[in-house]
Regions:
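Conserved C-terminal structural/oligomerization subdomain of aldehyde/semialdehyde dehydrogenase
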Residues: 5, 31, 315-455
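Rossmann-like NAD(P) dinucleotide-binding subdomain of oxidoreductase/dehydrogenase enzymes
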Residues: 95-234
Length: 873
């Protein structure tokens, strides 16, 4: 505990410097207090202030000559009781929030020393309020009182300090300027760590110009609209209650009332019946000259009774007159009644309709109360739309409905979710940094401790996957027996359609009495135009089931048709938007399956599209290939029937088989790989290396090889559907699009370059994903080699053996060694290389690669693959 100190008079720069040093010393100790210690001090300080609410109120009125003692008692009581109640259980010390599952911890720290500028209008209640906030947050505070209210402000601060110290707070945790001056106020703002400024626009501007963080409020010019639907008794008496409270010195109090024409007379009658005085033309002019002098508020009227202000104006009104009301028309600043008046003086306007009332209120706020408070009285049940319009139009941070604004604005009196406060933020409209009622959170620095956590991963596949040679009829039975489907739309290519591949499907549909039609105009690289044409036929036929039959092209085209059929409003470019995390993407894919069930039947063993959420489509206008990805594109059912694979030609067998190899290798190396995808990838590779050469050589005579390859391709598809692919596919997509190579061939020409690239233990940049904590792809490739029994003692040797094994497999199935070998003209390749590189870099697959590629690195890999060189990347 710090040594006992008595407050030394602060009346000079030197004395203030000493006070700052003392408060900082005390705050340094206070910063180590526990929540229990702080809460004990907070309670004691609030209790002491509450007990002195009457003496402090009397002192304030006596010293300032403004306001009403009884109302200041309420303000003092409110500042102590409501602030204590609001924050008594709020954590402000140490760990205030913790979520161990997500690894997030929030730690509250004090800011330091608060400079508190106190207004003359609320000199004791604001001092209590700010001192309590500082104590609850373990901050020190130095108060700069208004010269006109310094004694009562200091008395309030002293009372809080005494109680706090007796409860265990460090001596000197609260201090003040005894002889306030502009010089000392500026100094206290510049030397503090944060400023709580409550006062006029000049003081608030000075706070924001001090170079220190400031929370300041400005002038209010609250308009209150009384709609024709309003409860007039409620509206008028609420406004009187608010406007007369402490003689109108709450900055949120009504300055103008705007009444709709239909109820204007009734409102005026009620005001008069309740003791308000309406000024005639002559009296109005006299009061105008009194309330505003040379464009500024006359300080002599602030917080005075209506009778006193009338007397200053040379107007006789009853001594018990509650409010002086001036019926005026102009909302321009040239109209004195349009200004903030901080006294029981009110402007009253007539509006022909609600829109005109909004216009008037809008102008009054713009000229003098941006950001502060606005008020409306209406039937909140039947006129909700008017509330919405009012809230939309008013540039104020507190929009009060059927509420006296003085009491309503400060919070917790007429709405119990609006935080209690005596410093009301006005947001950027009012030149403030805060747009809400100021509370303890604004005097805290919150540290966020974020522990590393790994992403939630999943494994997703079609609802049903039928496997086994000859399983097609059994699988299709469900369309009738389980789903009761009526109309099927078949998507395939011209070759498959012309050669009878759709006949087993249509025969089964005929047997079940299900009508169907087919679209067979799918190209090898399906275009958006083709997909749109198919979707147009779908819209006409209105199927409840879609069957995609073919290789990746047919299934990809069918997926796009499915989207365009179910959601014709969907924008293709939005669907093609890249994402880092599929669950956080900007574009949300529309919900699929509401019109049609989707079945995929592959006729080649390679793409895996039957079990993936991906589709590749080409924009025929630009030639750009777009890989789309979303789990809404995942087929509902996949039918892996080797009967459809038996007669695949050698070229297709080779290209699709090596495509499946790249799927499995990239899925195993991917940053998002899991135990589930690893098992599928390794299993697929084992099968492919054994059975692809047999399927290639023996064709339809080797049933076992064909069926094994069908299953392996689907397993690899499931692996990359969840682990995603990498830069090999990014590059292959663009190589195929630019130079019209089959997709599987493009992958085959690039995969070994990518393995070498990814296996670097010192990459220029590694991929970004929480699970991927260090470059370990070399070891992953070595694991593949081990699984395939390729030999080698080091990871480097094993990886080289994997590359050799892939080269040997490619040679066995007739894949050429280089891009150049496929007749791609060198000058054309080089001329388009930079564009191809940039598009490959921007491909959706790039982000999942374990080594994040630079464009120069992608370029070198393309060059190596073209020339068959081995230039290090």
């Amino acid at each position: 505990m710090a040594n006992h100190r008595t407050h030394e008079t602060v009346d000079s720069v030197e004395a203030l410097s000493k006070a700052f040093a003392d408060v900082r010393e005390a705050q340094k100790e206070f910063a180590s207090f526990t929540q229990e210690q702080v809460d004990k001090i907070f309670l004691a300080a609030a209790s002491a202030a509450d007990k002195l609410r009457i003496p402090l109120a009397k002192f304030a009125v006596e010293e300032t000559g403004m306001g009403v003692v009884e109302d200041k008692v309420i303000k003092n009581h409110y500042a102590a009781e409501y602030i204590y109640n609001a924050y008594k259980n709020t954590k402000t010390c140490g760990i205030i929030e913790e979520d161990s599952a997500f690894g997030i911890k929030k730690v509250a720290e004090p800011i330091g020393v608060v400079a508190a500028v106190i207004p003359t209008t609320n000199p004791t209640s604001t001092a209590i309020f700010k001192c309590l906030l500082a104590l609850k947050t373990r901050n020190g505070i130095i108060i700069s009182p208004h010269p006109r209210a310094k004694k009562c402000t200091i008395a309030a601060a002293e009372a809080v300090l005494k109680a706090a110290v007796e409860a265990g707070a460090p001596e000197g945790i609260i201090s003040w300027i005894d002889v306030p001056s502009l010089e000392l106020t500026n100094m206290v703002m510049k030397e503090s760590d944060i400023i709580l400024a409550t006062g006029g626009p000049g003081m608030v501007k000075a706070a924001y110009s001090s170079g220190k963080p400031a929370i300041g409020v400005g002038a209010g010019n609250t308009p209150a609209i009384i709609d024709e639907s309003a409860d007039i008794l409620l509206a008028v008496n609420s406004i009187i209650h608010s406007k007369t409270f402490d003689n109108g010195m709450i900055c949120a109090s009504e300055q103008s009332v705007i009444v709709l024409d239909k109820v204007y007379d009734a409102v005026k009658t009620e005001f008069e019946a309740r003791g308000c005085y309406f000024l005639n033309e002559e009296e109005l002019e006299k009061v105008r000259k009194t309330i505003i002098i040379n464009g500024a508020l006359n300080a002599k009227i602030v917080g005075q009774k209506a009778h006193t202000i009338a007397k200053l104006s040379g107007v006789e009104v009853p001594e018990n007159a509650k409010i002086l009301i001036g019926e005026v028309e102009s909302v321009d600043l040239s109209e004195e009644f349009a200004h903030e008046k901080l006294s029981p003086v009110l402007a009253m306007y007539k509006a022909s309709d609600f829109n005109e009332a909004l216009d008037k209120a809008d102008r009054l706020i713009a000229d003098g109360g941006f950001g502060h408070t606005s008020s409306v009285y209406l039937n909140a049940i039947t006129e909700k739309e008017k509330i919405n319009v009012f809230a939309e139009r008013m540039k104020t941070c507190r929009i009060l409905v059927n509420t006296p604004s003085s009491h309503g604005g400060i919070g917790d009196l007429y709405n119990f979710k609006l935080a209690p406060s005596l410093t009301l933020g006005c947001g950027s409209w009012g030149g403030n940094s805060v747009s809400e009622n100021v509370g303890v959170k604004h005097l805290l620095n919150i540290k966020t401790v974020a522990e590393r956590r790994e992403n939630m991963l999943w494994f997703r596949a079609p609802q049903k996957v039928y496997i086994k040679k000859g399983c097609l009829p059994v699988a299709l039975d469900e369309l009738k027996t389980v789903m009761n489907k009526k109309k099927v739309f078949i998507v395939t290519d011209n070759f498959l359609y012309s050669n009878g591949y759709t006949k087993p499907i249509t025969d089964k549909l005929d047997e079940m009495g299900i009508s169907y039609t087919a679209f067979w105009d799918v190209e090898p690289d399906p275009t958006l135009a083709s997909a749109k044409a198919g979707a147009a036929l779908m819209q006409s036929f209105k199927p409840d089931c879609i069957i995609a039959l073919g290789g990746g092209s047919a299934m990809d085209a069918a997926k796009i048709m499915w989207v365009l059929y179910e959601h014709p409003e969907a924008d293709f470019m939005d669907m093609a938007m890249r994402f880092i995390d599929i669950r956080k993407r900007i574009y949300t894919f529309p919900k699929m399956g509401e019109k049609a069930y989707f079945i995929a039947i592959p006729t080649s063993a390679g793409t895996g599209s039957e079990v993936t959420p991906f589709a590749v489509i080409t924009d025929e206008k630009t030639g750009v290939k777009y890989p789309l990805a979303d789990y809404e594109l995942l087929p509902n059912m996949a039918i892996i029937d080797a009967d459809y694979h038996m007669s695949a030609p050698k070229g297709l067998t080779a290209a699709s088989g090596i495509d499946a190899v790249t799927h499995a290798v990239e899925a195993y190396a991917a940053m998002l790989a899991t135990d589930y995808t690893d098992s599928l990838a390794l299993g697929a590779l084992k099968v492919i290396f054994e059975y692809l050469p047999r399927a290639y050589e023996n064709g339809q005579t080797d049933v076992e090889a064909r069926e094994k390859m069908a299953n392996a391709a689907t397993m690899a598809g499931m692996a990359f559907a969840n682990a995603f692919l990498g830069v090999c596919h990014s590059m292959a997509h663009k190589l195929g699009a630019f130079h019209h190579l089959p997709h599987g061939v493009a992958n085959a020409l690039l995969i070994n370059e990518v393995i070498r690239f990814n296996s670097s233990e010192t990459p220029v940049k590694m991929g970004t994903f929480s699970q991927y904590d260090h470059p370990h792809t070399l070891a992953r490739y070595a694991e593949i080699a081990d699984h395939l029994g390729l030999g080698g003692t080091t990871n480097e040797e094993k990886t080289e053996n994997l590359i050799k094994a892939i080269d040997e497999l490619k040679e066995k199935v007739g894949i050429k060694k280089t891009i150049k070998d496929y007749g791609i003209d060198e000058s054309d390749f080089l001329a388009r290389l930079d564009e191809m590189v940039e598009q490959a870099f921007d491909d959706q697959c790039t982000g999942a690669n374990p080594r994040y590629p630079l464009m120069s690195e992608i370029k070198q890999m393309y060059l190596n693959a073209y020339y068959g060189t081995n230039e290090r990347v």
